[in-house]
């Protein structure tokens, strides 16, 4: 019942954010998987821009793939979250494991875990924890990057505008004769 409720909340979250949270795959029966193997995986695609390397903001990763592993004692035991696409972040280990912090409560649903992951990958300063660093190189880079380009963070407010070709408009496009009767 709890896992079904979590999946419903993930679907509601996805709808509320314009399908920027996609449930890519899960096993057919999460409860059976946990009972038989001791864990189950929920795979997500988060369509929020993030930092794939030190080359940000020149290079932006638009989608982040995440695997959330639920152990047999879930929800009493915190889920384990791992990013499987490149990310350069102070609170994400080089292996991709996310440092979610120590705030886990069994009453917390997976939707709240996903919201926290979104805050992490978008460099939301309300959740960025430089006191408990998983990647010191990323922290040093981030400190310099935010000084150089403070508007590039959080990454979800920084959108890359693709150059577009201008549509030529001239007065010759307007009809030269307009009658007094409007036609």
Predicted features and spans:
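UBC/E2-like fold recognition across ubiquitin and ubiquitin-like conjugation systems
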Residues: 1-63, 73-183
